[in-house]
Amino acid sequence: MLSIRRSLTLAKEPKDLFLFLCNLRARCVSTDDYDPPFSPLSKPTKPPKEKKKQKTKKQDQSSELVNDLKIPVISDLPFDFRYSYSETNPEIEPIGFREPKRFSPFGPGRLDRKWTGTTALASPEIDQSQWVEERARVLGETLTEDEVTELIERYRHSDCTRQINLGKGGVTHNMIDDIHNHWKKAEAVRIKCLGVPTLDMDNICFHLEEKSGGKIVYRNINILVLYRGRNYDPKSRPIIPLMLWKPHPPIYPRLVKNVADGLEFEETKEMRNRGLHSPALMKLTRNGVYVNVVGRVREEFETEEIVRLDCTHVGMSDCKRIGVKLKEMVPCVPILFKDEQIILWRGKRTGEEELVTL
C-alpha cells in the first residue's frame, strides 16, 4: 500500500506529468490521412525526378525555337528599310558618314539586304504589284458608315489602350512592327503625333498606309486611327526584321549658306539683323503640334519679306528639322538659326508673282 501511494505522488509531480502526457499523445496519433490544422505533419512533396524531367522538356523547347530561326532573315517587303521613312528624303545624298557602312543596325549577318549607311536596299526581284494586290485583299470591302463610326468611337479617345506615340523620329522602321503587334488583338490602332513630323501630316499618313498596309479611317489634327482590314490574319503578317540600335545620322550639306542665293553678303547680313529684331510670328513649344505653321508662314509671306519663329526651349536640333521642312513645303529660304530663333526669307520673286499677290 505504501509503495502504490508513493508512485501516485511521484506521478503528480509536474515533470513526470508532462512526460506522461507526451507519451500518451504519441500513442494516440493515428496513421490515417486526416491532417488537422496546426498539425506537425507536412504535406507530401513532389519527387525531385519529375522536376528534372520538366526542366529538360523546357530546355528542349527553347533549343527547338533557336534552331527554327533562319539567319539571315528574308523579308518580302518591296520597299527599302530606313530608320525613319517620313523624316528622311532619299533624293538628298549625304556627303559623309559618322560610322562605317559595314555596321548594319540590323546586326551582323541577320538580314539578307545590304546596308548602304542610310538604307537596306530591297531586292529588285520583289514584285511590287503583288504587294499591292495582297494589301487590297487584306483590306477587303470598304467599311460602312456605321462600322466606321463604331470603330472611331472605340479608338479615338485618350484612354485607349491601343495607342502608339509618334515623336520627332516620325514613322520609324520598328514602329511598323509595333503596329502589327497591336493588330494581333485589336482591329485598329490610335496614333498620337507630336513634334516636328506634325508639320506634314499628309506625309505621315502616306507612309503609315504604305509601310503597314492598313488604312487611316480617322484623322483629327494630330490624332490618327489606323485600321488593319477585314481579312487581316496575324499568322500571315509580313516579316519585319527589327533594328537593334539607332544608326548614327549621316552628314548632309549645310542648310544655311554664308551668302543666300540671289543676294550679296551685305544684304544677307542686313536681312538677318532685321529678322532678329522683327516681332515673332509664332512661338513654338517643345514636342508641340505644328499643323498650322506652314499655312501661317505662307500668309505672312504675302505681305512680309522676312519671318521669325520663336523656338525657345525647343532645341537646336528640332529647329533645324523645322527649317528643313519649311524650306520644302512653303517654300522659303532659311537664312539664320540663332538662340533658338528661325529666320526665314521668302526669296526673290518675279514680276508676275508680285502682281498676283497684289
From Swiss-Prot:
GO CC terms of this entry: mitochondrion; ribonucleoprotein complex
One of the GO BP terms on file: mRNA processing
Range of the transit peptide: 1-28
Region: Disordered, residue numbers: 35-64
Highest rank taxon of the organism: Eukaryota
PANTHER family to which the protein is assigned, alphabetical: CRS2-ASSOCIATED FACTOR 1, CHLOROPLASTIC, CRS2-ASSOCIATED FACTOR 2, MITOCHONDRIAL
Protein name: CRS2-associated factor 2, mitochondrial
Organism the protein comes from: Arabidopsis thaliana
